Each structure stands twice: as structure tokens, then as C-alpha cells.
Amino acid sequence: MTTLHFSGFPRVGAFRELKFAQEKYWRKEISEQELLAVAKDLREKNWKHQVAANADFVAVGDFTFYDHILDLQVATGAIPARFGFDSQNLSLEQFFQLARGNKDQFAIEMTKWFDTNYHYLVPEFHADTEFKANAKHYVQQLQEAQALGLKAKPTVVGPLTFLWVGKEKGAVEFDRLSLLPKLLPVYVEILTALVEAGAEWIQIDEPALAVDLPKEWVEAYKDVYATLSKVSAKILLSTYFGSVAEHAALLKALPVDGLHIDLVRAPEQLDAFADYDKVLSAGVIDGRNIWRANLNKVLETVEPLQAKLGDRLWISSSCSLLHTPFDLSVEEKLKANKPDLYSWLAFTLQKTQELRVLKAALNEGRDSVAEELAASQAAADSRANSSEIHRADVAKRLADLPANADQRKSPFADRIKAQQAWLNLPLLPTTNIGSFPQTTEIRQARSAFKKGELSAADYEAAMKKEIALVVEEQEKLDLDVLVHGEAERNDMVEYFGELLSGFAFTQYGWVQSYGSRCVKPPIIFGDVSRPEAMTVAWSTYAQSLTKRPMKGMLTGPVTILQWSFVRNDIPRSTVCKQIALALNDEVLDLEKAGIKVIQIDEPAIREGLPLKRADWDAYLNWAGESFRLSSAGCEDSTQIHTHMCYSEFNDILPAIAAMDADVITIETSRSDMELLTAFGEFQYPNDIGPGVYDIHSPRVPTEAEVEHLLRKAIEVVPVERLWVNPDCGLKTRGWKETLEQLQVMMNVTRKLRAELAK
């Protein structure tokens, strides 16, 4: 009989219950016990959904109050020593301080989890890091599930992936792989504690196997799993996000009891494991996208597998369902307005049912689920033949693009002269990245407007009032290039998606980005175009309030692509170029309206990189072309900015330079300007604004901290090409700390300008 299991589930709840409870706890509106009760209820509900799908195991250990890699830092005693906390007796309050910072310490650095839109907290490893086991997080969840009479499979990120996703810190140079001999016994203790608590199977996640690992890291898998296999539980080694076929010989030889492979991202890798002689878990339902599977096609893959493997075949989603929204059935508006599109979708709960149908078809025959299979086929056929998806005018515009359509009129050296002639900026010009605090009043006005409780005129007046406040406060602070604050925008991608054709939206399609932050990605289901101007009215209103230059603010094509659920029937590169041309219409309209500084945000450029380096060039070529297409045709005097965050650029700097933005602002404060060194060594040719303080924390930096970062920047970037700005947009901050943080930034800038003028 085929076994059905789950790798992981969304944590936040169908209606973001965890987010709201966390934020109430942080505001001291509920007690720790009340927060714990919400979490316990969510875990139980998740397990019940897995049971309802006829799962043989429920997943435990996947739930977290913030991030599963932070949980692992606590479980291994690898929390940063700079906090002075005891990992063996860490309070929930201290756990949150690790993630969010406190008055004495900045938060742990955050970056993207492989090529997803989820952020994890980056482990800080020092040459003298000591590890200490604390399995409480995993054991408690296992016992909770057992108390409900459930058969549970704990899931833990493996030791090599844990080291791989961390960073070396401290003055002493070392290779973090050298910490493995100290880390491994701690893993043995954690797994042993789970065995003693009754775990039969333990899933160990090693997504690092899907990237280009150095040879010594690959070799280390032999010793690691030889050691871990001595623990008396069965180990399911789980890989995902890409192919591990190149490691097939190694993986077949490892003394583990089962292997999970991602057959959605890399279906071709199945051939490499055709002769695998243990449990093979086939990840056949997409854990990262929202399209309904054609179950008949999936069965064409798994039925021959079952014939060969028998009871050794397990089925699951490709990866944790963390990356998908919770439940399609609550999307009543989408069902009413776009019934065809609704029928093509599957969220987490629908995916669990797809797996239930597959299990039944395999174990009891296709006839036992004939109705469900027919419905799946009908949805696939409807989507393949829909006229809602393909538009001849969009296809023609792309096909008719002339050669060099993506190039600016002149090189940067000429453009910057034309720009400075009218901008007349001082040394170390200051700006903001874009958004200002989204207050309760803003959110209430937007909600009331969407519900029809507030008229369009009243909504516009409310937003204009907020824009006027943002402009006034920036002028008081004496910033050089202003932003309008984006009060009218719910989300930097959703806002544009709502105004572009080919996009659709959900009401409750939230996925976790980090901690309590959730995003509701748009669905790109069809060809993309721009019916009318999207930002011109707001930007020109803001410009009318000030003599200082006002930045137009757009989200770039690659980021819109990366942060959406993208159609999977045409290449992503084609979708991206469609978005770029729609944005180009907006850029040229802004320019016509007198907005001559325009920022095209591309925070997601790096996360779009394929996991295998061999595939990078193709991606970077079409991503760069898409960015340039979005700003093509501008006058030399129009200054194009871009912003990138959560990123490491060292290995893609030529591609970043080839985007040819006049000014790039980047997130650097949490990494102590580490990123900037690469820009200096590469001699990045255009202007650059490294973030001088971390906006992800409410903490107000000291002037000494900001000065330290700015001086580091001056050492690396020629001062005439250096801008000063926060790390990122200020949407999630409160007004009080925002103004205090910006005041510190301005005080330091003035001090250094005076010094440089001498």
C-alpha cells in the first residue's frame, strides 16, 4: 500500500490567526498563555486536515512562532552569543528578541530560503561556536500529536543544510563546515530524544543537496548519515526545490531508510532513482504554486512506480506546503467573479485532497475516485483551451520589439551629468526607499473603501492627507529626494497586479513571508498589459506639494513575477517581458507628467536565480532585459533608481551593473556593510545607496552605529556616487520610531558632509 505523508504545513492559519495573536502579544494586549493557546489550536487544526486527507503520518516540528531555522538555532544552542541568552532556558520573549532585536542588539540577519519568498534567520557561526542540544520544540509537538492519538513524523532541517544556510562571523577566518564534528553529536541527542518520545520515522530535510555544493560538503553527507543512522528511528532524507540526480549514487548508498525527491521542480530526476531499493517518497503535488494538478497525468508517473516499489512508494507534496495559501474554498468572490480560474486552482487544503485522491487511486484503483479524476481532467482541459488567457495584441507587441529596445539613449556617464544639472544634489544625497508607516487609519480607510463603505472621493482625500503628512515630515527632516509614502498601496506587488490585466486576486490567499509578516501574492493567469495609468495621479499630487524632487515608485517586472503565483503554461521569461512592457508605459507617462526620478524596485532579482549555477546566465539575461525594457525610452535627464533587499550580490554583480539603473539602493545594515565590499571590488559604475540602518526592527540606532556604517561605505564607494538611505521601506514601522530613525540618519549625514567639505 502506498503511504501518504506531509513535509510541512502553513503555520499562520486560514485567516492569519497566528499573525494577529503574535502582534497582540508584542503590543502586550494578550498574555503568553493566550498566544500559546492560539498556536496549540492551529497545530491541532493542521493535523486534523492531514488526517482528513487520509495521511499515514502528520508532520510535527514544522510549526514555529517565527522561523524554523531560528527554532533549530535554539535546539542546537547556536543562538548568537551577543544576546547573552541561555538557549537551554530561552523564554518566548527572548526568542522574539533574537528575531526582532532589542535595545542592545540588532536582530539576526534575515534572507530568502533558497529561491522562495520565505525568509529565514541566518545562523551566526563563529570559529569557537559551541553547540548544546535542546529538543524541547520538536518533542513537545510530537507529544501533542500523540496525545490526540495521531501517528506523527517529526521534521528537522539536517545538519549540513543548517551549516550551509548560516554565515561565518567573527575575526577568525574559518570554514563553517569545520563545525560539523561539534554539531553532529547534538543532532544525535535531538534525534534520540525524539525516539525516546516515540518517533518511528524522522524526516531530515536537506534542500542544500539541490544547490551546487562544494565537493567536501557532498562528501560530508556520508559521515553525517552514517552517524545519524545509528539512532534507532527510521530516517527519511528529504530533498526539494530542485534535482539531486547528480548525487544519486551517494544518496542510494546512504544508510537512511527513505528518500524524498521533488518531482514537480525536477521530474526528470526520477530516472536516476529508478533502482532505489528503500522507501522512495515522490513529491508529485506542487508545494510552491497554486495550480490544480492534472491527477491523471500524475498517476501516469506514480502508477508505474507503485508497480515497481509496492509498499516502498510514499507520496507527498514536492516540499512543505508552507509556501501555498491555506484554503481555496473560502474564496467566494473569486468563485463568483472568475469561476473558470477558481476551478483551475488548489491551495493547501485542496492539495491535501489531491494527495488523498492519488493515494486512493493507487491503493484501490482509479475507479474508486473516478468522479474526482474526471473533475481534475475537466479543469485541466478548460484551462488549456481558455480564451481568457491568451491575447493576440500582447503577443504581437513582444514579437515586434526592435533590436536594442531595452537600451537607454546614452551611457551612464552622460546621463548622470544631465540629471545632476537639474537635481543639483549635495554630497551624500538622502532619500527614502519608498513606503512610510501604514497606520491603522490608512488600513481602515482602504478596507472601508474596498467594502464600499467609503466613497472614492473620501478615500482619495484620506490618502492625500497621508501623502501631505509624509511630504511635510520629509521636508522637516531636510531629505533631498522625497517619496510620497505609498499610503494608497496595500502591498508593493498586489497594488500593481490589481491595475494590470492578466492578474487575479484572492481575499485570504496569505502566505508567510517572515515572522508575523504575510503576503497575498497575485495570481498571474493570463497575458499582461496596462489598461490605464496606475501611479501618475498620486505622484503628481505629491510633487505639487514640494519643490524638491519626488520619486515615482514602481515595482519591477522580475519582482512582480517572483512575488506572484505565476502561470505555468508559458515560460516565466515571457511573462516577465509582458510585465516589463506594461511598466514601461507607466514610466513614460510619469516622465511626461514631470516625475523625473523614478524608482523601479527589484528586491527579488537574486531570489529568482536558479539553484544550479549552470542555469544562471539564461535567467540573468532575461531578468536584466526585462528591467531595462521597463525603463527604455526615458530621457537622459530622468534618473532611474532601483532597490534590492535581502540579497547577496557578490556573484551576480556584472548582471546587476548590466541593469544600468542610475542609482541602486541596497539592504546592507544587518550584514555590517559586508555586501558593499563586493560593489567596491567590482568597481560598480553607477550611484549606490547602501542602507545605513535596519528597518525590520523598531529599535532606533545610535548615531555611532549609523556613522560606523556610513564611514565603512565611504571607504568602499567614491563619495560623489554615494547616497544615504534606510535599508528598506518603512511600511511596517510606527511613526515615532520612523522619525527618530530618520533623524539619526540625517544628523550623521550632516556631520559627515561638514567633514568632507573641509
UniProtKB/Swiss-Prot annotation:
For the ligand (5-methyltetrahydropteroyltri-L-glutamate), the binding residues are 16-19, 112, 517-518, 563, 607
According to its UniProt entry, the protein's GO biological process terms are: methionine biosynthetic process; methylation
Q: Main EC class of this protein?
A: transferase
**Keywords, ordered alphabetically:** Amino-acid biosynthesis, Metal-binding, Methionine biosynthesis, Methyltransferase, Repeat, Transferase, Zinc
Q: Where is the signal peptide?
A: none
Write down the chemical reaction(s) this protein catalyses: 5-methyltetrahydropteroyltri-L-glutamate + L-homocysteine = tetrahydropteroyltri-L-glutamate + L-methionine
Query: Pathway listed for it?
Result: Amino-acid biosynthesis; L-methionine biosynthesis via de novo pathway; L-methionine from L-homocysteine (MetE route): step 1/1
Coiled-coil zones: none
Q: Per UniProt, where does L-homocysteine bind?
A: 433-435, 486, 601
Residues where L-methionine binds: 433-435, 486, 601
InterPro entries attached to this UniProt entry = Cbl-indep_Met_Synth_N, Cobalamin-indep_Met_synthase, Met_Synth_C/arc, UROD/MetE-like_sf
The record's remark on the cofactor is: Binds 1 zinc ion per subunit.
Which residues participate in Zn(2+) binding?
Answer: 643, 645, 667, 728
Tell me the GO molecular function terms.
5-methyltetrahydropteroyltriglutamate-homocysteine S-methyltransferase activity; zinc ion binding
Q: What positions constitute the catalytic site?
A: 696
User: What family does the database annotate?
Assistant: Belongs to the vitamin-B12 independent methionine synthase family.
**What protein name does the entry list?**
5-methyltetrahydropteroyltriglutamate--homocysteine methyltransferase
